[in-house]
């Protein structure tokens, strides 16, 4: 389960005062044993493992705010290193990738119509190539990339998502976000 059920990382005014312990107690009481990471979880891999073990829980995924739409593959690999190692240390097999480059997510004064967009197939192909290579890198480290399309980002609409998935291989999975 994702801690967004209790506390929202994007809009801290929604549950920002809810302690992590409340999420863990209530989540495990209703039968969940796996949690996606949020901002309230310990950053240190060993502290994270110990915290979750205290509730009989494990890490099942961790969000990564990616910038491949406007950055390089090499920079993204450097940026993800500590997070990926934390997931691997904790036995986690899935990383949720959300593209945040140029995103208007969280900017409530900016209309969603001003979100970034790829306007040519060449831009889509370049992005898909980098994302696919990033997914291959994660896979070589035992992690599956689960792509999270998102409101206010480059990949938002059904058409965007269809285009992206057609241009990538099984190195890029799709997150079912309910």
Residue positions per predicted region:
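Hydrophobic faces of well-ordered beta-strands that scaffold small-molecule active sites
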Residues: 1-4, 35-37, 59-64, 95-97, ...
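Active-site acidic/histidine proton-transfer and metal-coordination neighborhood
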Residues: 73-176
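Catalytic alpha-helical scaffold of carbohydrate-active enzymes acting on polysaccharides/glycoconjugates
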Residues: 24-28, 55, 169
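Aromatic-lined substrate-binding rim segments of carbohydrate-active enzymes
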Residues: 43-63, 82
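Catalytic domains of carbohydrate-active enzymes, especially glycoside hydrolases
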Residues: 18-42, 89-95
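Acidic-and-aromatic substrate-binding clefts and catalytic sites of carbohydrate-active enzymes
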Residues: 34-47, 66-78, 151-157, 178
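A short acidic, helix-capping loop that chelates divalent metal ions and anchors anionic groups
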Residues: 7-10, 67-71, 106
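Boundary/entry segment of secreted carbohydrate-active catalytic domains
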Residues: 1-19
